[in-house]
């Protein structure tokens, strides 16, 4: 089981002080968050991708490459790579380059994002969002697996005898998660390729999230990649912790009330009851996270969002310390104890390379 942090890279005013960090401060804070995640023993840091204010995460591979040079163990990922508006050729080359720089500590999450205007900014039509996602990923999948590609589609110029460079490290493409919060077509796509499926698990009730994950699991088995319970699932979650729940709720309430997506509707208490948001003690976060397994089955990756509401960096780092010291060690033990032997771990470069070598050896022996 992998545990980590995911961020969307927003620049948000702290409602308790009225201070808004500069873009430079926010970019550097994201790096600091990643370094803290490795320091406390977490496994993954994932950054989003946005091309509009109030976000600064416009170039994920630039940031992840910088973090790669400062870390040794952390898996570097994205909480969204925009498969709809990025050229698949550029994605193939950028993430292969990052693989080489990070010695394979790379995977990525494909998504369509949640900002409609980004489509025309990059010359695309939002009404074609799903077809774009399907076609672009089909090309990306081939670019990483075929040395020479001839390709023609609807949304970009054809390719003739094209080779993307550098080639994936050790001939092993980065593992891909397909992220979606509402689109069954994306769950179907993840299942078709035998890739992972990730739900951010923040704003939606468990009944909604369960429908998409269950669809993905059924279709994963349908396409012959393994049993439904062997499908590779990742979840997000938003948490805020203090030693006791009363202090956590008191401190977090102004951030909730002033948040553009959460404030102004249900109360904090109602929101926590209706969604996976957990504000309370470390034990409450442990209990809530373990309950995800009851709702969605055994899964492979749990990422927490701890920085998305304007909380100052000092507070964010305190949250990561609590995760590393009090929450994740318990979760690792509890998730491992109940995990059937046939349920796989999250793929890594090392495990994918080992599987590739084994497959090649088997083919050579039988051939």
For each feature predicted by the language model, list its residue ranges.
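N-terminal beta1-alpha1-beta2 module of alpha/beta enzyme domains
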Residues: 1-76, 173, 343-345, 356-361
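Active-site mouth loops of central-metabolism enzymes
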Residues: 14-27, 81-89, 172-182, 273-282
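Internal, glycine-rich beta/alpha segment that forms the wall or movable "lid"
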Residues: 16, 87-195, 210, 214, ...
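Glycine-rich, proline-tolerant flexible connector loops at the mouths of alpha/beta enzymes
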Residues: 44-67, 82, 114, 201-204, ...
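Aromatic-lined glycan-binding groove of carbohydrate-active enzymes
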Residues: 185-191, 196, 209-220, 224-262
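N-terminal small/glycine-rich loop or linker at the start of catalytic domains
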Residues: 1-21, 115-118, 157-172, 263-274, ...
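Conserved, mostly hydrophobic/aromatic
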Residues: 3, 41, 49, 67, ...
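Hydrophobic faces of well-ordered beta-strands that scaffold small-molecule active sites
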Residues: 3-7, 45-47, 76-78, 106-110, ...
